[in-house]
Amino acid sequence: MNAWFAEVQQKFIADFIEKDRWTYITDGLKITIIVTLLALILGLILGILIAMVRCTHDQTHPKWFRSPGNFFLKLADAICRLYITVIRGTPTLVQLLIINFVILVSAQKITVAVITFGINSGAYVAEIIRGGIMGVDKGQMEAGRSLGMSYVTTMKDIILPQAMKSALPALINEMITLL
């Protein structure tokens, strides 16, 4: 048994230290960190935009043909719901294979990974942020609006800071999952 450990130690030293194979591990770690950070940024941007569309639709309840803005908000909400349902309903590996071999065939592999993981993370982040926004008391929006603030200003200055505070643990979990 002791000879086996000595042999494993000798092979480890020969492979990783003497033949400089440890550089493969550090190169892989660099790529992993780059892909994770870029996908995280893309996922946060997508998630916040989609959550805002979904929450605006849920809070205003627009009718289809009252105005062109209502029509586009309904259409954007339907597209966002479809995106979230499809992306959250398919495995990440399947998404990676489809984007790599069907959609972005000639792209670099790191670019494909960033886009795929960013799109996947965006769907989860959207639901996390939407849950945080919906968790803020309705009176907060009414208070901001009664002070003369616009809907966008009320969301930006009053609702989103409270929502991000309550959604932060779930967002950190999503970031760890992305890693």
Regions found by a protein language model. Give the residues of each.
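Transmembrane alpha-helices and adjacent helix-loop boundaries
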Residues: 1-179
